[in-house]
Amino acid sequence: MDILFYHPTFDISEWAALLQRHLPHARLRAWQPGDNAAADYALVWHPPYDMLRGRVDLKAIFALGAGVDSLLSRLNEYPDLLPSGVPLYRMEDTGMAAQMQEYAISQVLHWFRRFDDYAALQREARWEPLEEYRHADFQVGVLGAGVLGGQVAQSLSRMGFPVRCWSRSCKALPGVESFAGPDELSAFLHGTRVLINLLPNTPETVGIINAQLLAALNDNAYVLNLARGVHLVEEDLLAALDRGKVKGAMLDVFQQEPLPHESPLWRHPRVRITPHVAAVTRPEEAVAFIAQSITRIERGDIPPNQVDVARGY
């Protein structure tokens, strides 16, 4: 079994060694320009145009990340980038859900326990106990109710926060109030104190966190963007922060990455930044998922996490 591999930064030797443990008869081959030899599967991240074009012999393509927007967005320019009829799969929960829960929970608690406010008091050498927030007044709204969004929402619900989610279609999540579709977005936003974004990147969700949406949040709201930078209109967030509508923001993703040095987000006192590290692909978990998926395909089954190219996720 031959498996093509392309990632601009991952070390193929580590992936090859891990794959041997799960699929001893598989051979991982680093794709190089001009490599047109046959292969059974492909593992890719930001693949060059010539890598996959015309490879209709592939049984499946695995994108080495939870999102596939960077791949699908190129189809408008290169319609033949992906070979016709070959299923595409994504890494949906290869350790990413646990990482995302850790990140989201830590930040919600940071705001809930008013650590930003206490840090400001410390800079002024002021000893001043503040009125504590109540869980009932700290409504959390999660945009996106897939595997990542759903698990984040349920984790926060178990901690006593009132939690709601909004997605394309209604989802039944224990302890979470569900909203769906454009007609229910306003109701979802009403009263939301903490907005967590875990939406997929599709044409419908680009720029969704804009001035109109931010204005519909509760006063002194908080914004946590963990999905994609294109979801957020950064200028609108800065304006909402300066007006006091939004009290604080934690951003892991940006319209342009790396975030340019001149971006005002770097220097805003109520914005915290991390460099797209909320949930990363861990080789051990990713290889185990890929091996299980390949085993299922070889048996004639369809693994989970197949991408609907038309929907974009």
Curated annotation (Swiss-Prot):
One of its GO terms (cellular component) is cytoplasm. GO terms for molecular function: glyoxylate reductase (NADPH) activity; hydroxypyruvate reductase (NADH) activity; hydroxypyruvate reductase (NADPH) activity; NAD binding. Its EC number is 1.1.1.79, 1.1.1.81. It is an enzyme of class 1 (oxidoreductase). Keywords: Cytoplasm, NAD, NADP, Oxidoreductase. It catalyses: glycolate + NADP(+) = glyoxylate + NADPH + H(+); (R)-glycerate + NAD(+) = 3-hydroxypyruvate + NADH + H(+); (R)-glycerate + NADP(+) = 3-hydroxypyruvate + NADPH + H(+). The active site is at 228, 276 (proton donor). It is found in: Cytoplasm. Gene3D superfamilies: NAD(P)-binding Rossmann-like Domain (3.40.50.720). HAMAP family: 2_Hacid_dh_C_GhrA. NCBIfam families: PRK15469.1. Belongs to the D-isomer specific 2-hydroxyacid dehydrogenase family. GhrA subfamily. Catalyzes the NADPH-dependent reduction of glyoxylate and hydroxypyruvate into glycolate and glycerate, respectively. This is Glyoxylate/hydroxypyruvate reductase A. It comes from Cronobacter sakazakii (strain ATCC BAA-894) (Enterobacter sakazakii). The gene is ghrA.
